[in-house]
Amino acid sequence: MSLTGWFTEDFTLAELKQLKARERIPQYRTANTQYNDQFEIPTLDEIIDLAAKHYQKTGKIIGLYLETKHPTNFQKQNLAMEDTLLKTLSKYQYSRDIAPIY
């Protein structure tokens, strides 16, 4: 199958940080559209930092549910993400047995 268009791998992180998040299917999740264009697309480091700040403020643990999208496609382009993902998780001690990651 051949796909055309723009993909994350076509951009640098600096370029991606200029974009704002939008609801992908507004016809089904209309309530989410109130947040359109309000937030940057976060990096994993930023999400982990946000979870840590929430814990410090409230004492409530926020778990991470990560999903890599189309990893074989990225591998074919020599952009495998698994090692980088594992290094990032390890940096924040999410490699422990009790880490709230799913």
Locate predicted features.
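Metal-dependent phosphodiesterase/phospholipase catalytic core, i.e.
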Residues: M1-Y102
